[in-house]
Amino acid sequence: YTSAEMSCFMIGDIDVDAIEAQIKKMFSDIPAQPNAAKREYYPVNDNKEPIVLVYQDKEQSNVQALIFNKHEATPDEQKGDMGYLVQNYATTLINNMLNARLNELVQTANPPYIYAATYDDDFFVAKTKDAFTGVVVCKEDAIENGIATLLRETERARQFGFTETEYNRARAEYLRQLESAYNERDKRKNEEYVDEYVRHFLDNEPIPGIENEYAI
């Protein structure tokens, strides 16, 4: 950790000039380290055969399985255009529609799992590879059926997509949440701003602001 790799965020009802001066006073004298280690981003190789890891924890009463499908991460320099926001919108709705299907199966008389969901994000802590990830939680004697159901529903969505009704429902919910965030924009908590700025600093995630997102 060096000063060149750090940032400081101050959020709140503050005197900007006074706080900025105080931050400069506290941190400007920290010297740069001429021999600091270079920050490296290592590639994550693809694999043809599945890599399986099993970990046992006696305190866990249920079994959890995570299935990662790796894919290339969006380069930081491509995250500043409208195409990236459109990509995020599509990814969000795809996962929301698939998760709605998975949740419906929990409501059946004989559910295949206790919980199941999908999301798309970093592959563990890697910055050079993302992963479409499926999570399923089952009783110990139902793990095979739980994993099979998760994979089957994911493949069904990949091959045949979703219905217009599913899309309209997911889109309406997405817009409802966006409108709610816009209407409550003056009540946002400080940590919500901090989270946005941290993601921008570390991963170059855009910060369009709720006003612009709502307008788009």
Task: Identify the meaning behind each predicted range.
Residues 7-62, 172, 176-183:
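An aromatic/glycine/proline-enriched structural segment found at the starts
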